[in-house]
A protein has these predicted regions:
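Short, structured secondary-structure boundary patches
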Residues: 84-96, 145-154
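Flexible, glycine-rich phosphate/dinucleotide-binding loops
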Residues: 54, 78, 113, 136, ...
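Domain-level signal for Mg2+-assisted phosphodiester chemistry and nucleotide/NA-binding surfaces
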Residues: 1-86, 119-122, 126, 132-133
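A glycine-rich beta-strand to alpha-helix segment
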Residues: 91-136
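Short, surface-exposed amphipathic charged segments that create phosphate/polyanion-binding patches used
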Residues: 62-63, 82-90, 142-144, 161-162
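Acidic, PIN/NYN-like endoribonuclease modules and their adjacent C-terminal/linker elements
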Residues: 117-162
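Short, well-ordered beta-strand core segments
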Residues: 68, 104, 148-149
């Protein structure tokens, strides 16, 4: 019997990348997409990224791997550091798609998503929060997700880029 779950993933790409790098490895995004699909029945995986023109080949490969990319323009701050703050875009997309999925998986460690995660949890639409690393995961996020939080540190063997 085929599983009829229709789950969506909403991925804070910068938070995911930095979290995995802090563990000393790089994520294979193609393997991660397949993992989400096979293990958690994720039909649609939104990847929120700050748009940098020079990364066009990377964006194309992510789309080929099955991600729906949502771009945010980036600008250097006063220190010359480039950051694409995608938090509002991710929250908006979760709510736009709300009637179209059974459960949401939010991939981040960022406490700014506390209210979103609490809302999804309270309305039984949260599959879980997937955080790269327990030590860098916001206490607020842990509080709002309660028992519906998983950490990626132990997935290195399955998801590491080789």
């Amino acid at each position: 019997m085929k599983n009829k779950e229709n789950n969506f993933a909403f991925i804070d790409s910068q938070n995911l990348n930095l979290g995995i790098q802090s563990l000393g490895w790089a994520l294979d995004f193609k393997r991660f997409r397949k993992y989400l699909q096979e293990k958690y029945h994720v039909k649609t995986a939104y990847l929120f990224v700050g748009y940098i023109q020079e990364n066009q080949d990377l964006y194309s490969s992510l789309q080929k791997a099955g991600y729906v990319l949502i771009f945010k323009p980036v600008f250097p701050n006063h220190d010359g550091e480039v950051k694409g703050n995608v938090d509002a875009d991710l929250v908006l997309q979760v709510m736009i798609e709300y009637p179209n999925y059974d459960k949401a998986i939010i991939v981040t460690s960022d406490g700014d998503f506390y209210s979103l995660v609490k809302y999804l949890y309270d309305n039984k639409k949260l599959k879980f929060v997937m955080s790269p690393y327990v030590k860098t995961c916001s206490k607020l996020l842990k509080k709002s997700a309660k028992e519906k939080i998983v950490f990626m540190a132990n997935l290195r063997e399955k998801l590491e880029y080789k």
